[in-house]
From Swiss-Prot:
SMART domains: TPR (SM00028). GO terms for biological process: atrial septum development; cilium assembly; convergent extension; convergent extension involved in gastrulation; determination of intestine left/right asymmetry; determination of left/right symmetry; determination of liver left/right asymmetry; determination of pancreatic left/right asymmetry. It is linked to Nephronophthisis 3: An autosomal recessive disorder resulting in end-stage renal disease. It is characterized by polyuria, polydipsia, anemia. Onset of terminal renal failure occurr significantly later (median age, 19 years) than in juvenile nephronophthisis. Renal pathology is characterized by alterations of tubular basement membranes, tubular atrophy and dilation, sclerosing tubulointerstitial nephropathy, and renal cyst development predominantly at the corticomedullary junction. Renal-hepatic-pancreatic dysplasia 1: A disease characterized by cystic malformations of the kidneys, liver, and pancreas. The pathological findings consist of multicystic dysplastic kidneys, dilated and dysgenetic bile ducts, a dysplastic pancreas with dilated ducts, cysts, fibrosis and inflammatory infiltrates. Changing S1314T: In NPHP3; likely benign. This is Nephrocystin-3. It is found in: Cell projection, Cilium. InterPro entries: NPHP3-like_N, NPHP3_ab_dom, NPHP3_hel, P-loop_NTPase, TPR-like_helical_dom_sf, TPR_NPHP3, TPR_rpt. Residues 83-207 form a coiled coil. The gene is NPHP3. Residues 1296-1330 are annotated as: Disordered. A lipid is attached at G2 (N-myristoyl glycine).
Length: 1330
């Protein structure tokens, strides 16, 4: 084991000698061997290795030969004691470390074991929870499926219930209306029997008197509102009518005070006053005869005539002033055309020139010294043959030392002599031509504004439509947004539809339509069906004219749908227009939603509301309703039962009629008979002096035998084609070609080829094609001025000649100043002939897009660009360009302000934006626009844009977002204008309306009061704008159930409406009516005829409604003088004029004159009319009121007694009207302190009221109150108290029945208010019966 000297055992002991030599004989201790510790051995190894390394390469460690490991690990026996101690200490240290290590590891193992056990427990718990969650999930999933199943079943049950509910609702409505109709029939029969009994009694025949029986046949609990009566209140006798019952539903009595309007008594304008403006406007628009196209067109056509001498003046006018006039008319929504022809040496354009003169609004003649004979005929046509009295102007350039020719002087003399009856002005000018042309421009501008457009002020060019000085038209009647262009389009369409040179045998159809109107309700709509071009529009328009003539009390609402996808076929615009028509006939105009869905809900309600109040029938006529997109969805109200007095007539093509409608009663238009077809064609030929040969007539008879060749439009077109060929001299050829055409489309193609071949060159042919294509691809048509700008090389001569040819051949027509196709077949023919393929159509649309885009870039945003450009982008599928166009704030503003809300929404939906995105886009665009705004005008325009955005968002239902732009508009107006400016009041009103809709009534009340204060300061306390704020406050308080405050403000509003000068109607038509008045005025300047006298009377009524009393007085006097000359001084029509003049004098407080006129009218009517005639009763009534007003009570007594007699003869002794007359007479006696005479009259009236109206009727209460006052003044205080107590009980009962909203009546204070008769009772104008 090596050569170590000794190993010492720790236990001590034995000495072992070394027997192997080297040291010899040296004793040592032999240690006891133990197993070395691993750590010790490792340390020993390290030390051994370190020692060997330290010895160097040339030496070996000691004992290496005997084994390196042991020699390196153990010291020799000769080691020192400190080393041993060190090893022992090291050993001890290692042992302790080991023990510590062992213990720590054991603890770690125990900890890990515990942690493992804990994790196992947690794992088991989580596994259990997971299994529980999986079970819960499965359970919830099953519950969800069962809930969905239950939901679907509930939805099915709800749909079934809704269907059953609607079915029951319709059945109940049918039942109710049937019973109402039966009640009406019974009441009508009762009245007829009463009148028969009275006639028999008058003849001396003894009959049974129902008044003597104990039955209650003459009593009913149902009555109408608005019964007029005079009452005596607290010592001061009132003479105003009472409100009557506002809680009754059905009318059962007839009498002057039971009429809902004065029109019900004596026809249109029989007894109209200024507060009946809405009804007056509607009636005048409806019953006045139709006039020429130029009156209603929104195009100002200026026809220029010039000579070689005045060519410089005309060129200067066209260059410098025609664009200004065009811009002025464009700003007001009108077109301006300055049409002129070159000097026509060969007279080849004579027919076209005459046509242009006939269409023109204004003719200007530039003349110097001579007048060529070629122009003489045009001048005579324009200036001397001017039956409609259109404005005319002559610019006569004078020159020193030179005398005009005889022809010039003769023309000027003739025009000067006619100047009293024609609107011809002559400008004589010498000097600078430019100065003379400027004078002409000033005169033309004035003529356009005053005479043609009917505006009163002459400075409209200084006012922008968005300026702060011009309140937008829609604000004149609240929030209703009316598009005058849509209304003009309908008027012109109706005119064109009713124009027919030949009768088509419609009499049998007229009778069927009349039977529908007279048929008992309920009745579904009548379907007028027929093939394309069968004459449906002509039939309906002719029948409407007959109804207006024969039944003036019938309210007719009509709408003529144009081609598909045009504005007239927009369902929301149709419903909105018809709703506004219904609102026009209501007593007040409330806010109208523009949301299409809500419009569909509100229209039937307005229809039912008006039908309950209107005395006559209401007829709704919609032509070509099948052209409306998704017509069944948007016209759902047609399938519901209609009110009793409402009838609906719709026309459809046979092929496109919705299947569900085929079950309705149908009037089918058959093709013309061969005989009628032949007669129409021959008559068309005779109109141009062309006669067909016998052989040609036989061929014609053989040709017109099929349904397509006997179609009304085909026959008309055939006749026009032959007449045109006869004038051109190629009759045989064209007749042969016409025989080859077996339907309308092929015949239209022949017409196109014929007109195209008549063009002079290929350039003209191409222009014709392009014009027709542009009209075809446009939204609503193209104007002539737009065509002239699109094709600058084109002359007016070519354009007017082409349009004349296309118009005569039933291809094109005018509508709202635009060229459009007369018939759908013409539109279809052009599409098939010239627009094959989408690429061609797209190219023409792009041409229009470029034109209108250029307009926008020039800041020319007109109603035309707003109508066409977005629609064209939509048709092209250009979403980004449409998006950019909609963000042009003025385009969107134009669409919204004209009520095209649904159209605007459809564009945004096409772009892919929802409501919130729309709002954000507009806000961002407005903010960007605001950064560039400078100056007061721009800030005012910005405020208008913010206001429009607010109103738009309100209509979208985004009320919280609508507040922000309206508040911003208010801030801008307060800063840019003045805090007390009227436009600030407008902003406050709009902001308040949002808060009302948002149910934040406190905010709304504060804003309305601020607007009221500003309006009162700006306009005065009696202005309609002030009344609007009062009405808004009344509505607000009513929503909060504050009925007393609501009644207070509503009374103030109605009083203002009574006194206000109503220069405009509630909805539309003032400018049109003014132009019509001017036209009527000119038409009455001819011979003395009864019709002209009636027209003068109408004009007097119209000017009276406009508060132009002096002008009204002139026309009424002229009417009276003409009637006295034509009819004689004792004719009833003269009494009508006298009555109207008396009412006018009464209005002017000229009571003496009014008394004389009333007395003359009464004398005539007493001799000419029956004792119970309504006209006699009205004259008696108003003369009696006048006597009372003048204090001539003695004269009034016999008239009031006569009124009692008349009503007894008319309605029987127990009719409420008789009681009203008795009360009026009793009031008069009370004023004269003849209480003894008054008492029995009151008691008799009370008995009639109780028997006929019931003991708790308000009339009974008012009569009791009058009796109480009479007893009080007679000293019978106990009886007075008893009567007054009973009167108060009746009033309290009515108040509780109305939910606290008792109508205002006469009280002891003498305060009077009546909703139905809120008008001054002494102001009535009459008009001739129709």
């Amino acid at each position: 084991m090596g050569t170590a000297s000794s190993l010492v055992s720790p236990a001590g002991g034995e000495v072992i000698e070394d027997t192997y030599g080297a040291g010899g004989g040296e004793a040592c201790e032999i240690p006891v061997e133990v197993k070395p510790k691993a750590r010790l051995l490792r340390n020993s190894f390290r030390r051994g290795a370190g020692a060997a390394a330290g010895a160097g390469p040339g030496s070996l460690p000691r004992g290496v030969g005997a084994g390196g490991l042991l020699g390196a690990s153990f010291k020799s026996t000769g080691s020192s004691v400190p080393e041993l101690e060190y090893a022992a200490a090291e050993y001890e240290r290692l042992r302790k470390e080991y023990e510590i290590f062992r213990v720590s590891k054991n603890q770690e193992l125990l900890s890990m074991g515990r942690r493992e056990a804990k994790l196992d427990t947690e794992n088991k718990r989580l596994r259990a929870e997971l299994q529980a969650l999986q079970k819960t999930y499965q359970k919830i999933l099953r519950e969800k499926e069962s809930a969905l199943e239950a939901k679907y079943q509930a939805m099915e049950r709800a749909a079934t219930f809704e269907h059953d509910r609607d079915k029951v609702k319709r059945q109940f409505k049918i039942f109710r209306e049937t019973k109402e109709n039966e009640i009406q029939d019974l009441l009508r029969a009762k009245r007829e029997l009463e009148s028969k009994l009275q006639r028999l009694q008058a003849q001396g025949i003894q009959v049974f008197d129902p008044g003597e029986s104990d039955s209650d046949d003459n009593c009913t609990d149902v009555t109408a509102a608005g019964t007029q009566c005079e009452y005596w209140t607290g010592g001061a006798l009132g003479s105003e009518p009472s409100i009557g019952s506002m809680i009754q539903l059905q009318q059962s009595f007839r009498g002057p005070e039971f009429a809902h309007s004065s029109i019900d008594v004596e026809g249109p304008f029989a007894n109209v006053n200024r507060d009946d403006w809405d009804i007056a406007v509607a009636s005048l628009l409806q019953v006045t005869p139709l006039f020429s196209h130029s009156l209603w067109s929104n195009t100002v056509r200026c026809y220029l005539i010039y000579t070689d001498e005045t060519q410089p003046e005309m060129d200067l006018f066209l260059k410098d002033y025609s664009p200004k006039l065009k811009r002025m008319c464009e700003t007001m929504g009108y077109f301006f055309h300055a049409v002129y022809f070159p000097i026509d040496v060969e007279n080849q354009y004579l027919t076209v020139r005459k046509w242009e003169i006939e269409k023109s609004s204004l003719v200007i003649l530039f003349i110097h010294l001579t007048l060529p004979s070629l122009l003489l005929e045009d001048c005579e046509e324009a200036f001397l043959k001017n039956p409609e009295g259109k404005p005319r102007l002559i610019f006569h350039r004078l020159e020193d030392g030179k005398v005009s020719s005889d022809s010039v002087q003769q023309l000027i003399d003739q025009v000067s002599n006619l100047n009293k009856t024609s609107k011809a002005k002559i400008i004589d000018h010498s000097g600078d031509p430019a100065e003379g042309v400027y004078k002409t421009y000033i005169c033309v501008e004035k003529i356009i504004k005053q005479d043609i457009l009917g505006f009163e002020n002459t400075d409209l060019e200084t006012k922008d439509l968005g300026s702060e000085d011009s309140i937008p038209e829609e604000d004149d009647f609240g929030d209703v947004l009316w598009d005058i262009h849509d209304e003009q389009e309908q008027m012109e369409t109706f005119q064109q539809a009713s124009n027919s040179a030949h009768e088509l045998g419609f009499e049998k159809y007229y009778q069927r339509l009349n039977d529908l109107v007279a048929a008992p309700a309920p009745i579904p709509p009548l379907l007028v069906s027929g093939g394309p071009g069968s004459g449906k529009s002509l039939l309906l328009s002719k029948w409407i004219q007959l109804q207006q003539k024969n039944s003036p009390n019938t309210l007719i609402l009509s709408h003529f749908v144009g081609r598909p996808m045009s504005t007239s076929s927009e369902s929301s615009l149709i419903i909105k227009r018809l709703t506004l028509k219904l609102m026009q006939h209501s007593w007040s105009v409330s806010a109208l939603t523009l949301d299409p869905a809500k419009l569909l809900e509100e229209f039937p309600r307005w229809l039912e509301k008006l039908s309950a109040r209107h005395q006559g029938s209401i007829i709704i006529v919609i032509d070509s309703i099948d052209q409306v997109q998704q017509v069944e969805k948007h016209m759902k109200w047609l399938i519901d039962p209609l009110p009793v007095n409402v009838r609906v007539i719709v026309s459809v093509n046979v092929e496109t009629c919705p299947p569900a409608w085929r079950l309705w009663p149908t009037l089918h238009l058959d093709p013309l008979s061969p005989k009628d077809a032949k007669s129409i064609i021959i008559a068309e030929c005779h109109s141009v002096d062309i006669k067909l040969s016998k052989e040609q007539e036989k061929k014609l008879e053989r040709h017109c035998r099929s349904a397509t060749t006997c179609n009304a439009l085909y026959v008309t077109l055939f006749g026009k084609m032959i007449a045109r060929a006869g004038r051109a001299g190629n009759l045989d050829k064209i007749l042969h070609q016409c025989f080859q055409c077996q339907d309308t489309l092929s015949l239209y193609r022949l017409v196109l080829h014929s007109i195209r071949e008549s063009m002079a060159n290929d350039v003209d042919k191409e222009l014709m094609k392009q014009i027709l294509c542009l009209v075809n691809v446009s939204h609503n048509g193209v104007s002539e001025s737009e065509l002239m700008e699109l094709y600058p090389e084109m002359s007016w001569t070519f354009l007017t000649s082409l349009i004349h040819s296309l118009y005569k051949m039933c291809l094109l027509t005018y509508g709202c100043g635009l060229l459009r196709f007369q018939h759908l077949q013409a539109w279809e023919t052009v599409r098939l002939e010239y627009l094959e393929g989408p690429t061609v159509t797209s190219s023409y649309r792009q041409k229009l897009i470029n034109y209108f885009t250029l307009q926008l870039s020039q800041d020319r945003v007109t109603w035309r660009s707003a109508d066409e450009l977005p629609w064209l982008f939509q048709q092209q599928g250009s979403k980004q360009k449409l998006h950019d166009c909609l963000l042009n704030l003025f385009v969107s503003q134009n669409l919204y302000k004209r009520g095209h809300f649904a159209e605007l929404l459809s564009y945004w939906q096409f772009v892919g934006k929802d409501k919130s995105a729309m709002a954000t886009e507009y806000f961002d665009s407005l903010k960007q626009y605001e950064k560039n705004c400078e100056g007061e005008d721009n800030m005012s325009c910005l405020a208008d844009l913010y206001e429009t955005l607010g109103r738009f968002l309100k209509d979208l239902g985004l009320l919280s977002q609508a507040i922000v732009p309206l508040q911003r508009s208010l801030e801008i107006r307060e800063t840019a204008l003045d805090p007390d400016h009227p436009r600030v009041a407008q902003s406050l009103h709009q902001l308040a309306s949002v808060y009302v809709q948002w149910k934040k009534f406190g905010n709304a009340e504060q804003l309305y009061k601020q607007a009221l204060e500003i309006s009162e300061n700006a306009y005065g306390a009696d202005h309609p704008y002030t009344a609007r704020e009062l009405e808004a406050l009344a509505t607000l308080y009513q929503k909060q159930n504050k009925y007393e405050q609501a009644e207070h403000f509503r009374k103030k509003s109605f009083k203002i409406h009574q006194k206000a000068i109503k220069k405009k109607g509630n909805l539309y038509g003032f400018a049109l009516l003014r132009r019509r008045a001017l036209q009527l005025e000119e038409l009455t300047l001819g011979k003395d005829t009864p019709d002209n006298a009636r027209t003068l009377n109408e004009l007097g009524v119209l000017y009276y409604l406009q508060n132009n009393l002096e002008t009204a007085d002139q026309f009424l006097k002229r009417s009276l003088e003409m009637r006295e000359r034509v009819l004689g001084p004792d004719h009833p029509d003269c009494a009508q004029s006298l009555n109207n003049l008396a009412a006018l004098c009464n209005e002017k407080k000229q009571y003496d004159k009014a008394e004389e006129l009333y007395e003359r009218a009464l004398d005539i009517r007493r001799r000419a009319l029956a004792p119970d005639h309504p006209s006699l009763a009205y004259t008696v009534k108003h003369l009696a009121i006048l006597y009372k007003k003048m204090g001539k009570l003695d004269k009034a007594v016999p008239l009031y007694e006569l009124a009692v007699e008349i009503r007894q003869k008319s309605f029987g002794p127990k009719h409420p009207s008789v009681a009203t007359a008795l009360v009026n007479l009793a009031v008069l006696y009370s004023q004269m302190k003849k209480h003894v005479e008054a008492l029995p009259l009151y008691e008799r009236a009370l008995k009639i009221y109780e028997d006929s109206l019931g003991r708790m009727h308000p009339r009974v209460g008012e009569t009791l109150k009058n009796l109480a006052v009479l007893s009080y003044e007679g000293g019978d205080f106990e009886k007075a108290a008893e009567l007054y107590k009973r009167a108060m009980e009746i009033k309290e009962a009515e108040t509780s029945l109305l939910g606290g909203k008792a109508p205002s009546r006469h009280s002891s204070s003498g305060d009077t208010f009546s909703l139905k008769t809120a008008h001054s009772p002494n102001v009535f104008l009459q008009q001739g019966q129709r």
